Amino acid sequence: MAKRGPKTVGVSYRLGLTPGVFMESLVKVADNSGATLAKVIGVPHYKAVWRRIPGAAVGDIVIVSIRAGKPELRKQVMRAIVIRQRRPYRRPDGSWIAFEDNAVVIITPEGEPKGTEIRGPLAKEAAERWPKLSAMASIIV
């Protein structure tokens, strides 16, 4: 039977953005942490029907495996935040936005960004959800 009452405690309402980064996607690492290319290997807290491929949208956390970069970072499994996606998504004002690439920023297990700067633009949705990322970004779109 369906649950009644308020939604789960601790989960803020989030507009349903179109997922653009899925399992096995190769994404660019857009910070100066030392990694350059990563592969998405998981989406935490994703619940779906059987055999559906998990996906993440701008501002979501994903689990990535570092594929290219500094030798000490390669083959490491880390958490990251999606900051750009190629798949177009609609904003509440009616405009559609899409970026040139799929990009992530590596974060520590505590949720702090590992790098100190973000290369390229940062989506407004990710900046509103993660204030520390907006402080690192030079361009917010």
Curated annotation (Swiss-Prot):
Signal peptide residue numbers: none
Protein name: Large ribosomal subunit protein uL14
Keyword terms: Ribonucleoprotein, Ribosomal protein, RNA-binding, rRNA-binding
Protein family according to the UniProt entry: Belongs to the universal ribosomal protein uL14 family.
HAMAP family: Ribosomal_uL14
InterPro entries: Ribosomal_uL14 (IPR000218), Ribosomal_uL14_arc (IPR019971), Ribosomal_uL14_CS (IPR019972), Ribosomal_uL14_sf (IPR036853)
Lineage: Archaea, Thermoproteota, Thermoprotei, Thermofilales, Thermofilaceae
Molecular functions per Gene Ontology: large ribosomal subunit rRNA binding; structural constituent of ribosome
